[in-house]
Amino acid sequence: MAAIAIPENTRVFLLDIEGTTTPITFVKDILFPYIRENLEDYLSAHWEEDECKQDVHLLKKQTEEDLRQNKACHVHTVDQTVHTDEEKAIREVVENVLWQMAADRKTTALKQLQGHMWRAAYMMGRIKGEVYQDVVPAIRRWRHHGLKIYIYSSGSVEAQKLLFGYSVQGDILDLFDGHFDTNIGAKVESKSYENIAERIGCQPEEIMFLTDVTREAKAAEDAGVNVAVVVRPGNMELTEEERDHYRIITSFNQLELIGNV
């Protein structure tokens, strides 16, 4: 695809992760299977540690809330307090976590346990964050010209930092000026992008947001943010109307800093 000039007043790049800096398959094919395959061993190894106990406690609280909200639905319960049988208690937690993952739930309890497991895996070298080859050189070039780089992902800030801190290209956290997750707001709500601009200390129109999801692109655009939609292998197909409306790139290298130097 042809080069695309970014607006001259751009001061900040705001980057999505999944499908933008990182293959969309990384979470589905690497991170989630790691949880499923290693969950029981992880719990057995860390069961008596305070952090693990807190994770299990949150899962138990979530189960109680699920039962209160909809007693008719099938819920895998967690109740480690009544068991002296550690194996049985661990099995209950495993069943609950696998059930939540199969239902594609995003509960705080689930995300916290997953985050702790991924942290251990990254630190042991069992997982490395995948980053497209064009990403790091492009970011270095943008930074050289004085632009700031921020990440905005639905994954937690901690998960973001693990991915980039233990990436296939080494520790590249120094490339980023900050990280945002859904604590700042949902990615499909325009207010979130206004909040980010305010937090960074710039105007929305001074931000260039790169994402593969057009619902996010529209929300950012509605807030006055400039947008480019990233097309990578495995990303959702764009409609003809979307292709006509948005700047489309297949590589960060297509973005030219005309007037920004």
UniProtKB/Swiss-Prot annotation:
Tell me the pathway.
Answer: Amino-acid biosynthesis; L-methionine biosynthesis via salvage pathway; L-methionine from S-methyl-5-thio-alpha-D-ribose 1-phosphate: step 3/6; Amino-acid biosynthesis; L-methionine biosynthesis via salvage pathway; L-methionine from S-methyl-5-thio-alpha-D-ribose 1-phosphate: step 4/6
Where along the chain is substrate bound?
153-154, 187
Origin, by domain of life?
A: Eukaryota
Q: Which GO terms describe its cellular component?
A: cytoplasm; nucleus
In short, the EC number is 3.1.3.77
Which BP terms does GO give this entry? Answer: L-methionine salvage from methylthioadenosine
Which keywords describe this protein according to UniProt? Amino-acid biosynthesis, Cytoplasm, Hydrolase, Magnesium, Metal-binding, Methionine biosynthesis, Nucleus
Q: Which Gene3D superfamilies match?
A: 1.10.720.60, HAD superfamily/HAD-like
Q: Which reaction does it catalyse?
A: 5-methylsulfanyl-2,3-dioxopentyl phosphate + H2O = 1,2-dihydroxy-5-(methylsulfanyl)pent-1-en-3-one + phosphate
- Its predominant location is cytoplasm
Give its localization.
Answer: Cytoplasm; Nucleus
The terms under GO molecular function for this entry are: acireductone synthase activity; magnesium ion binding
**Cofactor binding: number and manner:** Binds 1 Mg(2+) ion per subunit.
Query: What SUPFAM superfamilies does the record point to?
Result: HAD-like
Necessary cofactors: Mg(2+)
Q: Where does Mg(2+) bind?
A: 16, 18, 212
Q: Which PANTHER family match?
A: ENOLASE-PHOSPHATASE E1
Quaternary data: Monomer.
Q: Which family does it belong to?
A: Belongs to the HAD-like hydrolase superfamily. MasA/MtnC family.
Cited HAMAP family: Salvage_MtnC, Salvage_MtnC_euk
The identity of this protein, by name, is: Enolase-phosphatase E1
Provide the species name. Answer: Danio rerio (Zebrafish)
What is this protein's gene name? Answer: enoph1
